[in-house]
Amino acid sequence: MLILLPPSETKRPGGAGRPFDASGLALPALAPQRSAVVDALIALSADEDAAARVLKLGPKQRSEVAVNAALRDAPTMAAVDRYTGVLFDALDAASLPSASRRWLGAHVLVHSAPFGPVGALDPIPAYRLGAGTSLPGVPALRRVWAEAVSAALGDRDPRFVLDLRSEAYVALGPVPDGIPTRYVRVVSEATDGAVRALNHFNKHAKGALVRRLADERPRISSAAGFVRWADAAGLRVRESAVGELELFA
């Protein structure tokens, strides 16, 4: 099983790893796209006012421009440790034992806007760029990434993909049709039986799910296998629309 996660806007600063290496991350075929987007971000950062406008930064966020300017030289840390926010706080990868972290490294990709999907343990620098940003110097991010990411995922050829990304990041790299995939929607059930999508708790539930998977390290190779594991783990999951699963929180 391969799990696809969205990134987070908030990130830990610093790191102790070597600087960014476009071809040293998971899916190395994406190195040209990674380099193009990173170079465009660095070029944009030469004009702080323009960068703040494009990245929609407020006065207290302008330090993010300098973060982007240093992308090629900045220290790195594992992607799963770099990101903070609701999903990654619930996952709390730093507190996992080594075997669970290795499981994350083997089974989880985090889909970023500047680097595309990267392995959970891949070293990445801090950055500021969202999926919907129109970045000068390169085509729309969807044009940069979608076809290339789909091809790279196809080359990896996982037996089953559990897609926990937001729809904005799905658009930057749809899973190829030939790969069995389930897109997960987090929902709740009201007392009247109505099922409603969740927002804030959506992220928490996804992070907690991945932590549970990393703790137990199951061998899952199909949607049916995932549903069986979830049922045994006391989680409520059901097939909904074609290609989708509902996770009840």
What are these model-predicted stretches?
Residues M1-R62:
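N-terminal "assembly arms/tails" that initiate or stabilize quaternary assembly
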Residues A16, V67-A70, A90, S188, ...:
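Generic signal for short, ordered secondary-structure residues
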Residues A93-A249:
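Internal, well-folded beta-alpha domain core
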Residues A52-A126:
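A glycine-rich, hydrophobic loop/mini-helix early in the fold
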